[in-house]
Swiss-Prot record:
Organism of provenance: Acaryochloris marina (strain MBIC 11017)
Family named by the database record: Belongs to the universal ribosomal protein uL22 family.
Entry GO CC: cytosolic large ribosomal subunit
PANTHER family, alphabetized: CHLOROPLAST 50S RIBOSOMAL PROTEIN L22-RELATED (PTHR13501), LARGE RIBOSOMAL SUBUNIT PROTEIN UL22M (PTHR13501:SF8)
Name by which UniProt lists this protein: Large ribosomal subunit protein uL22
GO molecular function, a single term: structural constituent of ribosome
Length: 120
């Protein structure tokens, strides 16, 4: 998908190794995909999920990349691609009764957001 992102008329940003479940991040990304930059900002500001903070940070970075590298106006930008891939799992151990230990897996994810100029 990365080669496809480089071909779009816009910019993208990534955040890697975010200590959050990709499933929970996708719930937020599904709400902003296809929306304009301003709408996406408003939606992310008022959603009650913990995943909104890193998604908002990546979205702002993608828009800054579009402004700086491509010279695009933020008013015309639309979230064209937004997805979360699974990252490596952090493995931890929790002590249990009678000297045993259970393995706890803490998920991570990689967030990618691409913005492109609106076709109007």
């Amino acid at each position: 998908m990365t080669t496809q992102l480089k071909d779009i008329n816009g910019a993208y940003a990534k955040a890697k190794y975010i200590r959050m479940s990709p499933r929970k991040v996708r719930r937020v990304l599904d709400q902003i995909r296809g929306r304009s930059y301003r709408e996406a900002l408003i939606v992310l500001e008022f959603m009650p999920y913990r995943a909104c903070e890193p998604v908002l940070k990546v979205l702002r970075s993608a828009v800054a990349n579009a402004e700086t590298n491509r010279g695009l106006d933020p008013v015309d930008l639309v979230v064209s691609h937004a997805y979360a891939d699974q990252g490596p799992r952090l493995k931890r151990f929790r002590p249990r009764a009678q000297g045993r230990a259970y393995q706890i897996q803490k998920p991570t994810c990689h967030i990618t957001i691409a913005v492109s100029a609106e076709a109007s």
